């Protein structure tokens, strides 16, 4: 049932991420927001990408939700291994931003967005990935004065 804006009295567009998660649950797919969408979900970018893409262990698929479409892009099992929850979101966002695109602002935004337990898990899991992402993960987890 669509949500209604009490002030405007009209129906709200469905939340794209909630819709994607519901589709993935129903299909028993594992999904991870890709690139620009991951950065947007974490507040690292205000830009909403024109194409909403999720990596999935399921087949390539496109689903229309209102006037928006969600693209599910099949990823190799190796590419999906270990990518779950906030860790997956952070890794995808960092890959999108690139090594040179991660500044103090992004580090601070992620420090705020992640709980202490999520920061510890990020550092632990990032050890096995790309070196620069591991270094960024350590900076995110550092205690600040």
Regions found by a protein language model. Name each.
Residues 42-50, 61-68, 113-121, 133-137:
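Short amphipathic alpha-helical patches
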Residues 21-23, 34-37, 96, 100-101:
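Positively charged, aromatic-accented nucleic-acid-binding surfaces
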Residues 16-28, 102-108:
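Short, charge-rich amphipathic segments
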Residues 1-23:
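Short beta-edge/loop segments at beta->alpha junctions of small alpha/beta modules
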Residues 69-73:
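Short, aliphatic-rich beta-strand segments
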Residues 15, 33, 37, 85-89:
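Generic recognition of short, well-ordered alpha-helical interface segments
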Residues 74-145:
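Hydrophobic alpha-helical interaction segments
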Residues 2-3, 24-66:
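Short gly/ser-rich loop at a beta-strand->alpha-helix junction or flexible surface loop bordering the NTP-binding
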């Amino acid at each position: 049932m669509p949500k209604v804006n009490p002030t405007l009295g009209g129906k709200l567009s469905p939340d794209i991420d909630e819709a994607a998660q519901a589709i993935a649950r129903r299909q028993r797919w594992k999904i991870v927001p890709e690139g620009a969408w991951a950065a947007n979900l974490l507040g690292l970018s205000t830009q909403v990408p024109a194409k909403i893409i999720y990596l999935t262990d399921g087949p390539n698929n496109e689903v229309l939700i209102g006037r928006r479409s969600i693209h599910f892009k099949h990823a190799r099992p190796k590419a999906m291994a270990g990518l779950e929850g906030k860790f997956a979101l952070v890794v995808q966002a960092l890959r999108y931003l690139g090594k040179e695109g991660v500044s103090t602002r992004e580090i601070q935004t992620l420090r705020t967005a992640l709980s202490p337990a999520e920061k510890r898990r990020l550092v632990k899991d990032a050890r096995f990935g790309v070196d620069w992402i591991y270094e960024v993960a350590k900076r995110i987890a550092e205690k600040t004065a």
